[in-house]
């Protein structure tokens, strides 16, 4: 284990007010120390490293120039917020990042007054910033609002909706576009720095405001002609006419790692801007840490690693991951059916669709951070006879719910939805938990909703979805590795709406939806040891339900427990609705539904989260004993 870095200048900075006492010439050294501190911290916790390394100078410059927290600073997504946390009173806890009871990996309002708006999903910062800017105007305060958004997040339509609205309102909003895709090289040299200072200066911006007032008296046609002439002329020097057309004053691109560029521009904008301003800053993801700079993903998300070598800790898996099983099964099916296509929203590696892209590049589409578009794009393909697999994380599918309802479900289009990261996801906390997909999909008429109990079942569900053309179909599976079951050479086509009994008993029935099946089987061992004969069943389907299986379990057992890693309103609620409507609760059946608790569960390891929720072996056994008014047997495994 390496020792924490020496940081004499950073040791003087606890809050931004301390930072503002430093001279400009001290800031490059401070940036080096912040990088060293962040690298050491993330090497111990894992997390999102590359994005934060790329915005160290920008973060320091913003806090140096603006009066945070009175001035509002909003980070989009939040992957880049680690330097911000170090500089805003949280350095003493930075080595608890993404750990149980530790700092969040994202900005959170409840964590600090320096986090005025929480983030984790993309493209929200400009909308939130605009709301805050308008609030400041209504209150007649001189509060500035700064939204920092990456070029990736700018691929989502919500960002442009907000830009368009901000321009129309002529709001006092500062948007900083952090361009770390390296598609545009940052300008270098004294002339580019001079032009950026000139464009952001009082004279130029004041002349622009004067021009706006003058042309207001000359009629709309002359106004438009003059405005276009000025902005197009300026565009030859600085670019950015698209943002100008939306009503933003555009500055840049400027070097996001040069304080000589950043500080004068930010100060000019602070002192002179009256309407919306967009500052285009070019940065390098992974800046200042050679292993990150050399890596293809710039160390976007990393495990714990060795600071000297950059080598990440790797735990040898006991079984293949669910994501890899899905990807291999989809490639296998795609090789046999040229109508199968894959769609991902900027997550080809995370969803495994990079494997499909390697095998069939013309049949795999990365649409960017645009889940709404992804779903309707898939609907269009389905309408033309293709078999689209729109692979999305559960938490991101939420962003496209209207498209799922209006464009897919109502039209009965056979779009396939592989739903990754279902259930608890651990260190990313409540913003990324896959909690609600079963509940919001199972309410839709004609929608088939499946959950894989293990990796072999997942393979069956991939083939089942490929073969199903009667309407939309989904299948959910968690993050992480499978349970190590024997794998079929190819998946089987499952009968729609039919579950399976895995273990037969007579007194207690445990009905699992998804990967909680393994804990149900373990719990059954403890229940059997306590003299309670236990049936364990795998529902497979939340919609359509297996009515025959439900009737059998309800009529021949004293107690029925449904278990799912999802919210209330999901599988258990569907079961309860059916049993009550059929009168199967009238004869004294004891029934319990185990779901995620109705709270936003904080980050922890998934197994700890399941234990807290009562969804593990011990929680299931405890639920049975409480319902049957029996004490917990000595020796029951936890």
From Swiss-Prot:
Binding sites annotated in the UniProt record for thiamine diphosphate: 79, 120-122, 152-153, 180, 289, 371
Name of the protein this chain belongs to: 1-deoxy-D-xylulose-5-phosphate synthase
Cofactor note: Binds 1 Mg(2+) ion per subunit.
GO MF terms held by the record: 1-deoxy-D-xylulose-5-phosphate synthase activity; magnesium ion binding; thiamine pyrophosphate binding
Enzyme class: transferase
E.C. numbers: 2.2.1.7
Transmembrane segments: none
Biological process, per Gene Ontology: 1-deoxy-D-xylulose 5-phosphate biosynthetic process; glyceraldehyde-3-phosphate metabolic process; terpenoid biosynthetic process; thiamine biosynthetic process
Binding site for Mg(2+): 151, 180
Taxonomic lineage from the root: Bacteria, Pseudomonadati, Pseudomonadota, Alphaproteobacteria, Hyphomicrobiales
Gene symbol of the encoding locus: dxs
